[in-house]
């Protein structure tokens, strides 16, 4: 019974585990700096099997980006016509993919969430915020539950908003 109580006390951190083996304490002192390129790292002693596998990876790595290289999203079209603004009226969160696809193509999206349940609308706004962050766009609240998502290469000015409002895009609340 005392063994079970001792194990519980060790688990809760109330006492130290006496069974700690100090022979292995210095095993993790050497660390690899992952910021250095692979060629500059000190090589370890490897078995021939590991070396052959490493050579195969090295040969194919000439065409692939390195692990430390940052990837940027695919560039959107250079110019986006404001006449291509897409207005979507999602009813469920499952329609988030459509919003993402249009936005990723560089098309400004007006999200009208008035027909959605509040919990799903909040999830969709969170999705849109992640989309905006990931693709360097901007999001504006037009009215209650209506949002304009603009890609990075598109700037919607007040004049453009007025022109869009005349056509009825913003008057959907």
From Swiss-Prot:
Looking up Pfam families in the UniProt record yields:
SepF
Keywords of this entry: Cell cycle, Cell division, Cytoplasm, Septation
Q: Which InterPro entries match?
A: Cell_div_SepF, Cell_div_SepF/SepF-rel, SepF-like_sf
**What are its GO cellular component terms?**
cytoplasm
Spans of biased composition, class Basic and acidic residues? 39-53, 60-72
Which one GO biological process term can you cite for this protein? FtsZ-dependent cytokinesis
Q: Say where the protein is mainly found.
A: cytoplasm
**PANTHER family named in the record:** CELL DIVISION PROTEIN SEPF
Q: What protein is this chain from? A: Cell division protein SepF
Classification from the root reads: Bacteria, Bacillati, Actinomycetota, Actinomycetes, Streptosporangiales
Which gene name does the record give?
Answer: sepF
């Amino acid at each position: 019974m005392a063994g079970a109580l001792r194990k519980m006390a060790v688990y809760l951190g109330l006492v130290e585990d006496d069974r700690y083996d100090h022979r292995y304490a210095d095993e993790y002192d050497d660390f690899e700096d992952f910021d250095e390129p692979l060629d500059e790292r000190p090589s370890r002693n490897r078995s021939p099997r590991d070396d052959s596998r490493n050579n195969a990876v090295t040969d194919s790595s000439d065409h692939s980006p390195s692990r430390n290289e940052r990837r940027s999203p695919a560039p959107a079209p250079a110019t986006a016509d404001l006449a291509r603004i897409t207005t979507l009226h999602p009813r469920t969160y499952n329609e988030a993919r459509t919003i993402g696809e249009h936005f990723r193509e560089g098309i400004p999206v007006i999200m009208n969430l008035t027909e959605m349940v509040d919990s799903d609308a909040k999830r969709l706004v969170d999705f849109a915020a992640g989309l905006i962050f990931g693709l360097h766009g901007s999001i504006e609240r037009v009215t209650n539950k209506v949002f304009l998502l603009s890609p990075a290469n598109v700037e919607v000015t007040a004049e453009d908003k007025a022109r869009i409002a005349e056509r009825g895009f913003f008057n959907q609340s």
